[in-house]
């Protein structure tokens, strides 16, 4: 079972704790009310520094970095931008920002909401990054994995025929963070769960529902 697949089991337990509310009450958020979701209560804490899980995390990162080829490293770095149009490989060449302004705007809001939600958890836990990773923000949970999960869930709602390809690409995007040596496996699993929770919460927001309907219509007009 992959890292992101295991996180789905955790989500099934967490979702019962989530109580949807109305529109966002924070100017930082478009579709989420941060009072709804406390990731520090919903996610397990990162592994203790002296634990067997921490050692396993470190070993998996070291092994991934050692085994990666120059081509794998190049593609992982090239594909690390958090944009919905990363999925053009799964959807097709017509899936680009120039043709899809409503989709561009909507998913930029989704990205912003997920980033702010993840930042709160990163600040709380302040887990150091893997050795050699030069990143200012904490390691846990992974913002890239959260973005990948949330975006894949939402995009597959309007493109169900491409669901398998979308999720396959999202998993690769998330797990590339380990290959790049900038996140631990537990960071990626927690990020995927956080993104799943965020997507579920957004679906209950009225502004989200209005904008998502516009995205659905735009993508259908584009015959994607």
Regions found by a protein language model. Give the residues of each.
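Interfacial helix-loop-helix junctions of multi-pass membrane proteins
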Residues: 172-210
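Polar helix-capping/helix-linker motif
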Residues: 6, 51-52, 205-208
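Bacterial N-terminal signal peptides that target proteins for export
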Residues: 1-11
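Non-catalytic nucleic-acid-binding interfaces of large nucleic-acid enzymes and RNP effectors
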Residues: 12, 16
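Primarily interfacial, aromatic-capped hydrophobic alpha-helices that serve as membrane anchors
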Residues: 214-224
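Hydrophobic alpha-helical bundle signature of multipass membrane enzymes
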Residues: 26-180, 193, 222
């Amino acid at each position: 079972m992959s890292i992101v697949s295991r996180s789905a089991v955790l989500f099934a337990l967490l979702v019962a704790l989530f109580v949807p509310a109305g529109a966002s009450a924070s100017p930082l958020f478009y579709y989420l009310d941060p009072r709804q979701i406390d990731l520090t209560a919903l996610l397990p804490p990162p592994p203790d520094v002296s634990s067997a899980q921490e050692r396993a995390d470190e070993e998996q990162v070291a092994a991934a970095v050692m085994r990666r080829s120059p081509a794998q490293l190049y593609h992982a770095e090239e594909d690390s931008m958090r944009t919905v149009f990363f999925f053009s490989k799964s959807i097709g060449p017509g899936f680009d920002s120039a043709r899809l302004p409503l989709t561009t705007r909507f998913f930029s809001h989704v990205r912003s909401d997920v980033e702010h939600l993840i930042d709160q958890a990163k600040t709380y836990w302040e887990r150091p990054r893997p050795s050699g990773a030069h990143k200012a923000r904490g390691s846990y949970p992974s913002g890239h994995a959260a973005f990948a999960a949330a975006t894949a869930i939402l995009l597959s709602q309007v493109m169900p025929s491409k669901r398998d390809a979308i999720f396959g690409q999202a998993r690769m995007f998330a797990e590339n963070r380990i290959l790049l040596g900038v996140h631990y496996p537990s960071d990626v699993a927690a990020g995927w769960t956080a993104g799943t929770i965020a997507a579920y919460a957004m679906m209950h927001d009225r502004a989200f529902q209005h904008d998502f309907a516009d995205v659905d219509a735009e993508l259908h007009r584009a015959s994607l």
